[in-house]
Amino acid sequence: MNQIINGIPVTYILGLAGILFSIGVLGVLIRRNIVIIFMSVELILNSVNLVFVTFSKALSHINGETIVFFVMAIAAAEAAVGLALVIAIFRHKKSTNVDELQSMKW
């Protein structure tokens, strides 16, 4: 799999996607702010989208790009619902720290 897409080798693009995925996973595991955690999850989803598009272009199939549209729609819905929950939790608890939100009791 040593193809070149628009002058960039596929391995470079996959390496970038791996780095983005790793940064996202580290953000989810290390950070305690729920907004940063949501941003890290979005970074993970975007790195997966990059892999889908890369393989779609390298193999000359449209399937990967089609899946990306569905993943983006799901990510947008997840972001909208997640941010609405974060706003509701912040209004009630006055904090976005995950450690302070251990119980789901109001």
UniProtKB/Swiss-Prot annotation:
Topology within the bilayer: Multi-pass membrane protein
Major localization class: membrane
UniProt keyword annotation of Glycoprotein present: no
Annotated GO biological process: ATP synthesis coupled electron transport
Annotated Pfam families: Oxidored_q2
A Gene Ontology molecular function term of the record: quinone binding
Gene Ontology CC annotations of this record: NADH dehydrogenase complex; plasma membrane
Catalytic reaction(s) noted: a quinone + NADH + 5 H(+)(in) = a quinol + NAD(+) + 4 H(+)(out)
Keywords: Cell inner membrane, Cell membrane, Membrane, NAD, Quinone, Translocase, Transmembrane, Transmembrane helix, Transport, Ubiquinone
Entry's localization field: Cell inner membrane
Enzymatic class: translocase
Origin superkingdom: Bacteria
EC number, as in UniProt: 7.1.1.-
Transmembrane segments: 10-30, 34-54, 67-87
Family designation: Belongs to the complex I subunit 4L family.
Protein purpose: NDH-1 shuttles electrons from NADH, via FMN and iron-sulfur (Fe-S) centers, to quinones in the respiratory chain. The immediate electron acceptor for the enzyme in this species is believed to be ubiquinone. Couples the redox reaction to proton translocation (for every two electrons transferred, four hydrogen ions are translocated across the cytoplasmic membrane), and thus conserves the redox energy in a proton gradient.
Subunit structure of this chain's protein: NDH-1 is composed of 14 different subunits. Subunits NuoA, H, J, K, L, M, N constitute the membrane sector of the complex.
Matches recorded under HAMAP family: NDH1_NuoK
Protein's recorded name: NADH-quinone oxidoreductase subunit K
Species name: Leptospira biflexa serovar Patoc (strain Patoc 1 / ATCC 23582 / Paris)
